[in-house]
UniProtKB/Swiss-Prot annotation:
Protein name: Probable spore coat protein sigD
Domain DSCP-N span(s) in chain numbering: 21-139
Organism: Dictyostelium discoideum (Social amoeba)
GO biological process assignments: sporulation resulting in formation of a cellular spore
Superkingdom of the source species: Eukaryota
Protein's job: May contribute to the structure of the coat at the interface between the middle, cellulosic layer and the outer, electron-dense, proteinaceous layer.
Ligase in keyword set: no
Keyword Magnesium: no
Signal sequence, start to end: 1-20
UniProt KW keywords: Repeat, Signal, Sporulation
Amino acid sequence: MKKVITLLALMAAAQIYAQGQECINLSENECHRNSSCVPVNFKKCCGDQQFACYEGDFNSCHYITKCYKSSKSLDVIESTNECYIPPAGYELFEPVSSCTNDELKHCSDQGKQCIFKRNDCPNPTSCCPGHGVCEDFNRSESGSGNKEQISTTGNTGPQTRGFTISGTGGTGSVPIDACTNVLCQQGEHCEVDQDGRAHCYVNIESIGTLPLGCLNVVCQPHQHCEIDKESGLAHCVLDINPIGFTTIDASSTVAGSSSTTGGSGGTGSNDICSNVHCPDNYHCEMRQDGKAQCVADINAIGFTTSGASTNGLIPPASTGWSDVCSNVICPPGYYCQKNEQTGKADCLNYSSSTTGGGTGSTTGSIDVCSNVICPPYFHCEKNDKGWAQCAADINAIGFSTSSTNGLVSTTGSNDVCQNVHCPQFFKCEKNENGLGECVSTLIPL
């Protein structure tokens, strides 16, 4: 028996090692389709986008921008996933978007001012926005476009992926022709980037009301961004009282109190869900056959979209697309469309697109799952609201319900399992607490 256990352990270790080696050798498309592998994008300063594939999943490998600098060549690499493994000799560092204190002092000692010159290249990165140079005071008054920034204070810290927070020194003059037809979202303003293109930036005064980690997060309707206190990561959670859905904190002793944590019991338009308790990151919905079903929350932790510039979302075939959008870069999760009433460019949220008229009208169809990467044992489906949703595979080996969060109960019938829908290979049984529980029908190995 011991030999059998040892042999099984060796086979498992060999399989894990083989999976890791397999990920490294996969193409980008193959890596996206393999649930055991994580696709990672990275690039050097002003370089082209590159790709690598590592073993892991999106529960442990989160999208986050990190900057690495070589101690020998001073080369810089920007990666967008925390599981990226840099080459030997590369270390983490924080870039600056204004003159450093040393550069300010150096220029001041020469009787000059420090000008932060942004890198002039086709593919700039937030890890190497530019550098400080010393120039005479009267030279900057003639202006040199938006690629120069006069600094009178220390550095303003690194840029956030998808957004740029302008410092107190500003980012230079804004040409009128680039921002004239740009209408930014609330809390943003239009500026011109180093390529002369209009860009919507977060207002500096908005920082006090929005966590920094949420600045590059676009949530679905009826959700908002919060920072997890334990991990420090940003994630989308349900609003306390979205239309037609109310979450209930079962542990609260105050009547009518609510909570936005996962695993909530949903009430509102569907009475059948009033006493159904779903696992974390799931909510209750009534199926067409009248049964209650726990459905994965949109954009739950572990649900990610690929791509760097637009979070992997593809702009729909829109009406009114014209030259007013040619110089507009919208924030991640948004696309540009001409407003027929004002003639200006609107940055619209992908999730707000409808099939009717108006500013957000669209034609054609969108494959909402085309760039969605789901966790292991999950697949992407288009739900009845038209959103991409990661749904559990009904026949995935290893998929099971939690002993505590997998409990469901119903009212209106003596049979607690009458309106409970379990995955394939699971059946509903009444447990010792009198609640319906989804129990596996498979025989353990």
